[in-house]
């Protein structure tokens, strides 16, 4: 029995891939501008990329930013993401601070979904997952490679490991340098959904060559896709209008 993840009015893991747009503001003013802009678009989930925020180590500023996003996009589930530099983030955050910030965000009890990177200390990850679930938040365990696409077996291994840690959703995003890389990601997505995972999956081949993976989730098994309203957070992201039109077209002609 496949599980879905229900957050607010959004069900992740069935139907069309849900569209997520990141907020990338460096200041409270920029976050407010982006949140107000996003409120005019039709999409499903907002991701706050807190690694872009200049005051990410100031908990009072983090709370203010979350309040601004909630005021403008309160009907949307929010993902809190503190992306590390090694996985494509904006700034370096030491291991201890990474977990401390994520813990304090969860303790606000005002978060829907937390993104935790796979390649951190296992015990710390499990502790954070337990805290998230205690405070009513879902967890994405993610892995990103902005240089290459690992082998199919390695993708399967990483996502199975993420699921075994207790994730509600697992995510893999890798760089596609050629069409073979794209096929590797699509087939790994198919295998994970058909043979391994009972939870929602996000699978993306980044870059222009991997663009098809952002649209074909309903066919191959990826449950969330990322789009942009302003700035991009990863190579190959397209506008929310383009993504929505193509995802809806595929849905219409595959059901």
From Swiss-Prot:
GO biological process: 3,4-dihydroxybenzoate biosynthetic process; amino acid biosynthetic process; aromatic amino acid family biosynthetic process; chorismate biosynthetic process
EC number: 4.2.1.10
Function summary: Involved in the third step of the chorismate pathway, which leads to the biosynthesis of aromatic amino acids. Catalyzes the cis-dehydration of 3-dehydroquinate (DHQ) and introduces the first double bond of the aromatic ring to yield 3-dehydroshikimate.
PANTHER family: 3-DEHYDROQUINATE DEHYDRATASE
Domain of life from the UniProt record: Bacteria
Residues that coordinate or bind 3-dehydroquinate: 47-49, 83, 214, 233, 237
Keyword Lyase found: yes
A GO molecular-function descriptor: 3-dehydroquinate dehydratase activity
CDD domains: DHQase_I
Name the record gives this protein: 3-dehydroquinate dehydratase
Catalytic activity, reaction form: 3-dehydroquinate = 3-dehydroshikimate + H2O
Pfam families (UniProt xref): DHquinase_I (PF01487)
Pathways per UniProt: Metabolic intermediate biosynthesis; chorismate biosynthesis; chorismate from D-erythrose 4-phosphate and phosphoenolpyruvate: step 3/7
Keyword annotations: Amino-acid biosynthesis, Aromatic amino acid biosynthesis, Lyase, Schiff base
InterPro entries: 3-dehydroquinate_DH_AS, Aldolase_TIM, DHquinase_I, Type-I_3-dehydroquinase
Active site: 144, 171
């Amino acid at each position: 029995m496949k599980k879905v993840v229900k957050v607010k009015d959004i069900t992740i893991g069935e139907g069309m891939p849900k569209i997520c747009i990141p907020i990338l503001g460096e200041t409270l003013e920029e976050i407010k501008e982006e949140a107000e802009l996003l409120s005019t678009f039709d999409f499903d989930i907002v991701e706050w990329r807190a690694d872009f925020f200049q005051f990410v180590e100031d908990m009072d500023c983090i709370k203010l930013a979350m309040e601004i996003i909630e005021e403008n996009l309160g009907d949307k589930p929010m993902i809190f993401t503190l992306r590390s530099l090694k996985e494509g983030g904006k700034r370096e955050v030491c291991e201890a601070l990474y977990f401390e910030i994520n813990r304090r965000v969860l303790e606000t009890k005002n978060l829907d979904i937390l993104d935790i990177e796979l390649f951190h200390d296992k015990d710390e990850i499990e502790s954070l997952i337990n805290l998230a679930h205690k405070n009513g938040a879902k967890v994405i365990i993610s892995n990103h490679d902005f240089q290459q696409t690992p082998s199919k077996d390695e993708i399967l291994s990483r996502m199975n490991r993420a699921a075994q840690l207790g994730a509600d959703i697992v995510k893999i995003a890798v760089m596609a340098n050629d069409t073979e890389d794209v096929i590797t990601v699509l087939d790994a997505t198919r295998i994970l959904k058909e043979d391994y995972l009972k939870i929602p999956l996000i699978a993306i081949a980044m870059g222009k060559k991997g663009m098809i993976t952002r649209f074909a989730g309903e066919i191959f098994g990826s449950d969330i896709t990322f789009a942009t309203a302003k700035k991009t957070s990863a190579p190959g992201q397209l506008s929310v209008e383009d993504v929505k039109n193509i995802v809806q077209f595929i849905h219409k002609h595959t059901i």
